[in-house]
Amino acid sequence: GKQAGFNEDRGQMFFHIIDILAAKKPRYVLLENVKNLKSHDKGRTFARIKQELEALGYKVFTDIFNTAQFQLPQTRNRLLIFATTEPVPANFEKLFTCDNIAATFEQVYQGLGTYHYQSVNDILSLEVDKKYFLSERIKPTLLADGSANFKSKSDINMSIARPLTATMHKMHRACQDNYYSQDFIESYGAINPVKTMSKEELALLPIRKLTPEEAFMLQGFPANFAINGRNAGVADGSLYKQAGNAVSVNTIYAVLYYLITNKI
């Protein structure tokens, strides 16, 4: 978001959570936020969050979790905050890590009923509505590399997707959002014109954005999740926003599985 910390309405939401915790006193709490929360305002924002939780009697454990480590092809780093009033092992701070929990998930995920994909190619549909394809007018802009104030390479056809955003329906440059050429999709990644063509040549190819169905699948939801939403009257823009704001199903499942099976 705007990274304004507690100085915006969304930042104040944390104190509503604290009020709920003080009233309901749950033994376990799991919170999720962007990875930059830990460094925001030179660490003072996170220190306040930790202080408020500890004042309610919680022990607090955190790490940055990457969706790509949980059998979903999306680089999505998020801060998870686990807090509990229950006893935990003395070394639990070293146990509650992305690497450790991902290693456990790696051993068991195939029997858990979660959805898993090795590459974005596993979820890309061969045929989609033409409205998802980029217009000839907009392609050169979206394919251009970042400006002087935002230098980043605008590559398409990423086998491991960039992090989905709540504003992806606005179609940012390819250095921020995910776009795919039709020949890359049809060849299951065997043909990747990014490696051989200039940006001008790429702009001549059929290139499209993710569909809402594909966006939700990258977050670990079933293929029909967006379809059901659309059938209920939810517009594509809202579906994209929901997918971008969602937590990755597999990541949260893996954390809860680890906590429950280890009787934390």
Please report, for each region that a protein language model flagged, where it lies by residue.
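C-terminal target-recognition/interaction regions appended to catalytic cores
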Residues: 131-264
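Class I S-adenosyl-L-methionine
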Residues: 1-171, 181-182, 186
